């Protein structure tokens, strides 16, 4: 006997959360890291209407709509992933954030030329993201899991130091080895804000959260332990309390 859509959806939710808790489930639940975005014509239209990427992220109605678009088109997906950007954290820490067409994000001033203590935090910049989470949660099928996220400290630090993306992370490595105390302070500041940010997403309705660490694979074992495993473990412990 075929199950009803509600029964299938309820089972999907249970399997997502069970899988994230390390349980063996089948069939495996499915969601995609970039399931909301440019491959969808409805996203491209909304993106064009908003003008800038940051305006889209900070319009909670629009960001909620983008988060839900893949679920409308592909109802078999078992989770929604929040539509936002990993650079919201350095924006909240006090760097200016812009997105340059054809080039990508820019953070100013880059921390190779500016002091961390000169940045003025604007943690209120996180509030619209929480509002997006609340709006998605209100419109989402109750049996579909909502996943929030943030950038992991190393990857976020790479952008903060260089002011933009870097394939070889040369500026970050130069600072980390040349002034390890400052680099550790940057990692620590990111940790603090990320704990608050992920906790805020959970309070707003996210059922699971994750960290994206794009550049972790480029590190030697000792660097990985110091700049990836240790801060990630501290964030996970703090958010899980």
Residue ranges and their predicted role:
Residues 125, 131-241:
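Active-site loop segments of alpha/beta catalytic cores
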Residues 52-77, 120-137, 182-196:
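Glycine-rich anion/phosphate-binding loops
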């Amino acid at each position: 006997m075929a199950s009803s859509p509600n029964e299938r959806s309820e089972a999907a939710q249970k399997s997502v959360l069970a899988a994230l808790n390390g349980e063996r489930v089948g069939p495996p639940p499915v969601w995609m890291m970039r399931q909301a975005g440019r491959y969808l014509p409805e996203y491209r239209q909304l993106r064009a209407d908003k003008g800038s990427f940051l305006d889209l992220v900070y319009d909670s109605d629009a960001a909620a709509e983008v988060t839900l678009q893949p679920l409308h088109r592909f109802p078999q997906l078992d989770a929604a992933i929040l539509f936002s950007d990993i650079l919201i954290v350095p924006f909240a820490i006090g760097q200016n954030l812009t997105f340059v067409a054809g080039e990508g994000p820019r953070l100013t001033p880059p921390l190779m030329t500016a002091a961390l203590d000169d940045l003025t935090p604007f943690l209120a910049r996180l509030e619209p993201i929480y509002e997006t989470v609340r709006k998605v949660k209100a419109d989402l099928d109750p049996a579909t899991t909502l996943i929030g996220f943030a950038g992991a400290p190393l990857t976020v630090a790479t952008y903060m130091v260089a002011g933009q993306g870097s394939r070889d992370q040369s500026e970050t490595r130069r600072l980390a080895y040349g002034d390890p105390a400052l680099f550790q302070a940057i990692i620590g500041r990111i940790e603090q804000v990320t704990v608050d940010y992920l906790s805020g997403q959970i309070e707003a309705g996210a059922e699971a959260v994750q960290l994206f660490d794009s550049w972790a694979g480029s590190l030697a074992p000792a660097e990985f332990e110091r700049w990836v495993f240790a801060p990630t473990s501290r964030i996970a412990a703090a958010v899980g309390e």
